[in-house]
């Protein structure tokens, strides 16, 4: 009411998204990169000489405002629509490349979708929505339900291919 505050504290959210406050002020809440509470920032400050963030890979290097434009725009295929594939497609697009993102399932997000199901893990779902929104906003060609095999590759030409198909879960065979 009086434009005063007793206490205002924002910590990890500013590491995830340095423009956090400006985006709230401008009504761009959907554009905020959400913190997942992994505490990578805390452990990195204790164990390393710099701060790292599990969701913001550009915290210690390039960021969205300093992405170097490519000298030559190339046609690039990113295989896999999980977090790594979404980030790769986004950065490549920002650099000026023509990007196709191929995902074998009917939706993007990869393992982050399942990670967001348990109670108190909804921040993973928010993060997945954020990554997907960025890719959609960049007009990246998205091909869902697409298997990239020899037949697919023979019908398309790409200068480079990035494989970001994720890890396989470790299954313990102790309960046979």
What does each of the following model-derived ranges do?
Residues 1, 134, 154-155:
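Structural alpha-helical scaffold elements that stabilize or flank donor/cofactor-binding regions
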Residues 1-79, 83, 87-99, 107, ...:
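Flavin-dependent oxidoreductase catalytic cores
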Residues 2-3, 22-26, 114-118, 157-160:
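Short low-complexity, flexible loop/linker segments enriched in glycine and/or proline
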Residues 19, 110-112, 154:
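Short Asp/Glu-rich motifs
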Residues 21, 132, 150-153:
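Short amphipathic alpha-helical segments and helix-helix/interface helices
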Residues 36-45, 69, 138-176:
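FAD-binding core/adjacent interface of flavoenzyme oxidoreductases
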Residues 78-141, 170:
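Beta1-alpha1 glycine-rich phosphate/pyrophosphate-binding loop at the start
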